[in-house]
């Protein structure tokens, strides 16, 4: 004890004396705004420092959210709202919090269904404040009043919280329910808790929770260009609305001259339009079919043009020969067409310009009393008409001609005969034959006849000049020879045109058959030649390999002269298949089905498919079509 007392006596006592007038020194870092001004003017209480610090943090998080395009405070004037916080005029803050543009009432303006829940929560909190005394408090009778600054700052933070876009929030505030039923989310409960805060510490807690729940990586302030991986130059950076990744307007391709307005998507997030494109196999088949149809149409048009040209040439040659045999043409010559029989029992005809030289032919003229000097035996000389009229005959009911006996067929042969009619000048050989000697089934009985018809003769029908039979009266002299020459020339021309048309029809049928074979489901073994690498011994067994692609190529190049060559190649393809493959294999079965299909289609198209695959003896040569 003596030692302790000795130590205390030697210890300087003045170190324990504290002067009462020494002003306290504040050791804190000054902040911006109101806190900085207050620190310069004098000492500030701890509660005021918390208030000023909270105002600065609220302004800072609001500015980062706004500059980073993560959201905005839903107030009429943002600058007025910020100035109210900076100047500590908290009464100017709006009483309404808006969420995504829609006004959301606070406190007493809540919906009816939430009033009871809200009121019960407030009553419970007030009851806890009134009934539960603090451990350090000495007054247990009066509750502590809530500061107005706490209420205003809580409302400001709630407005910021409601202004943040929901897609930029993460847990715990971003776990909204995805069910169809509207439920109270964590964010709503957090807002209720914030508005019921009674101290600055509670507001600080809600502020830190909000700061941790925001996706700051999506902010444009922290955005990196997806192309160049660089920050900065925010004025030239645009965010994709799909992935929220930044892109400089000069880094995207094609370059942008300015930041586009509205929604913008990067090339990866751009909505892709589905193109209704067919698979390559179907597209190739459709294209080839269209080309084949076009080629067929061109061939048919060219064939029709050639046939018309040949018919016109044959008609021109016939007219030239006839004009050479006749006298020089005169002006005013009229073409006369005589209907041989009418249903009314009368036949009309046109007479020449001088009817006084003609003579009407009636059944009385058919009696054996010839008047002219002609040498016909059983013919009745017709009155000579003007050379301008080739055929003339008239039967009228005025002369007492009955319907059955009034039919007179007048056939004029171009050629000068020896017989002369009773008229002026030198007449031409004309032959009249009574209708009594004409059979009812004869093709000449009910058909108008004219040698000057300009109508083209169909390819499958013989011209009218060929319908003259030897049973009719034959012309005499040179006219007979010339007429027979004309008939033979016309027969040869028609035979050539019909043969050519038949050959072209066969080749078009072959082309159609190839297309049908390629489209068939069982054509897969025959589409292309067998590869020697896959089947090495195939070419040792098969000496003449062939496939549908080769046949189709030969058809397109018009290498087949007749349909029999095409049919031989098709049968060679099947014989190769049956020779190499076993009869129970899939290839052989497909070949059998395809062969039966080919035979059926060929018969429907009019092609002759013989079992021995031999070509016909005579097939008219086919003319190659011009492409």
From Swiss-Prot:
Q: What are the Low complexity biased-composition ranges?
A: 348-359
**Polar residues bias locations:** 386-395, 402-412, 486-496
One GO cellular component assignment for this chain's record is: nucleus
Note the SS bond partners. Answer: none
Q: What would you give as a GO molecular function for this chain, any one?
A: zinc ion binding
One Pfam family recorded for the sequence: Bromodomain
Where it sits in the cell: the answer is: Nucleus
Can the keyword Zinc-finger be found in this entry's annotation? yes
Database matches in SUPFAM superfamilies? Bromodomain (SSF47370), FYVE/PHD zinc finger (SSF57903)
Instruction: State the coiled-coil residue ranges.
Output: 281-327
Q: Which InterPro entries match?
A: Acf1_Bromo, BAZ1A, Bromodomain, Bromodomain-like_sf, Bromodomain_CS, Zinc_finger_PHD-type_CS, Znf_FYVE_PHD, Znf_PHD
Could you tell me where the Acidic residues compositional bias lies?
287-326
Q: Where is this region: Disordered?
A: 270-503
Occurrences of domain Bromo (ranges): 502-605
Sorted alphabetically, which PROSITE patterns does this protein's record hold? BROMODOMAIN_1, BROMODOMAIN_2, ZF_PHD_1, ZF_PHD_2
Q: Give the free-text PTM comment from the record.
A: Phosphorylated in mitosis.
Please give the biological process terms from Gene Ontology that the record holds: chromatin remodeling; positive regulation of DNA replication; regulation of DNA-templated transcription; regulation of heterochromatin formation
Compositionally biased, Basic residues: which spans? 272-283, 417-431
Residue intervals of every PHD-type zinc finger in the record = 222-272
UniProt main location, coarse: nucleus
Assembly with partners or alone:
Together with p18 and p20 proteins, it forms the Xenopus version of CHRAC.
Q: What does this protein do?
A: Regulatory subunit of a chromatin remodeling complex, which forms ordered nucleosome arrays on chromatin and slides edge- and center-positioned histone octamers away from their original location on the DNA template to facilitate access to DNA during DNA-templated processes such as DNA replication, transcription, and repair. Involved in regulating the spacing of nucleosomes along the chromatin and have the ability to slide mononucleosomes to the center of a DNA template in an ATP-dependent manner. May play a role in transcriptional regulation.
* The protein, known as: Bromodomain adjacent to zinc finger domain protein 1A
Q: Which lineage?
A: Eukaryota, Metazoa, Chordata, Craniata, Vertebrata
């Amino acid at each position: 004890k003596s030692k302790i007392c000795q130590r205390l006596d030697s210890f300087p006592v003045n170190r324990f004396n504290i002067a009462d007038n020494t002003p306290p020194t504040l050791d804190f870092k000054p902040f911006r705004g109101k806190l900085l001004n207050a620190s310069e003017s004098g000492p500030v209480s701890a509660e005021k420092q918390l208030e000023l610090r909270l105002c600065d943090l609220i302004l800072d998080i609001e500015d980062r959210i706004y500059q980073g395009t993560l959201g905005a405070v839903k107030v009429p004037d943002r600058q007025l709202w910020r100035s109210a916080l900076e100047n500590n005029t908290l009464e100017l803050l709006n009483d309404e919090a808006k969420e995504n543009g829609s006004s959301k009432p606070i406190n007493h303006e809540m919906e009816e269904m939430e009033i009871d829940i809200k009121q019960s929560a407030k009553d419970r909190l007030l009851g806890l404040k009134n009934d539960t005394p603090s451990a350090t408090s000495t007054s247990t009778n009066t509750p502590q009043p809530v500061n107005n600054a706490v209420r205003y700052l809580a409302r400001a933070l709630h407005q910021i919280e409601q202004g943040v876009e929901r897609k930029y929030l993460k847990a715990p505030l971003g776990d909204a329910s995805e069910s169809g039923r509207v439920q109270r989310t964590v964010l709503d409960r957090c807002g209720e808790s914030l508005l019921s805060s009674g101290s600055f510490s509670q507001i600080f807690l809600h502020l830190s929770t909000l700061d941790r729940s925001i996706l700051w990586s999506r902010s444009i302030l922290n955005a990196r260009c997806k192309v160049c991986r660089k920050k900065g130059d925010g004025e030239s950076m645009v965010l994709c609305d799909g992935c929220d990744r930044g892109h400089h307007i000069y880094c995207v391709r094609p370059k942008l001259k300015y930041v586009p307005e509205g929604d913008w998507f990067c090339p990866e997030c751009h909505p892709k339009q589905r193109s209704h494109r067919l698979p390559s196999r179907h597209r190739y088949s459709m294209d080839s079919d269209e080309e084949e149809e076009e080629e067929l149409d061109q061939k048919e048009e060219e064939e029709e043009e050639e046939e018309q040209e040949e018919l016109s040439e044959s008609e021109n040659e016939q007219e030239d020969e006839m004009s050479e045999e006749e006298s020089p043409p005169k002006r005013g010559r009229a073409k006369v067409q005589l209907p041989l029989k009418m249903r009314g029992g009368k036949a009309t005809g046109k007479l020449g310009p001088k009817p006084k030289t003609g003579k009407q032919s009636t059944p009385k003229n058919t009696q054996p009393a010839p008047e002219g000097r002609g040498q016909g035996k059983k013919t009745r000389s017709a009155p000579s008409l003007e050379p301008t009229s080739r055929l003339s005959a008239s039967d009228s009911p005025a002369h007492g001609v009955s319907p059955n006996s009034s039919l007179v067929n007048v056939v004029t042969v171009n050629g000068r005969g020896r017989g002369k009619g009773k008229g002026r000048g030198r007449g031409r050989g004309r032959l009249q034959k009574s209708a009594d000697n004409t059979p009812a089934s004869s093709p000449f009985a009910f058909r108008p006849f004219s040698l000057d018809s300009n109508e083209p003769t169909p390819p499958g029908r013989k011209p009218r000049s060929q319908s003259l039979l030897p049973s009719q009266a034959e012309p005499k002299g040179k006219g007979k020879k010339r007429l027979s020459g004309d008939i033979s020339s016309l027969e040869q021309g028609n035979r050539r045109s019909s043969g050519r048309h038949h050959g072209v029809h066969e080749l078009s049928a072959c082309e159609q058959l190839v297309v049908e074979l390629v489209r068939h489901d069982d054509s897969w073994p025959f589409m292309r030649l067998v590869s020697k690498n896959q089947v090495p011994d195939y070419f040792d067994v098969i000496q003449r390999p062939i496939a549908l692609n080769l046949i189709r190529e030969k058809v397109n190049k018009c290498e087949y002269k007749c349909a029999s060559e095409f049919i031989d190649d098709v049968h060679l393809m099947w014989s190769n298949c049956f020779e190499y493959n076993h009869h129970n294999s899939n290839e052989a079965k497909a070949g059998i089905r395809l062969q039966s299909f080919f035979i059926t289609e060929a018969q429907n198209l009019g092609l002759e498919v013989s079992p021995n695959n031999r070509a016909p003896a005579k097939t008219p040569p086919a003319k190659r079509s011009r492409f």
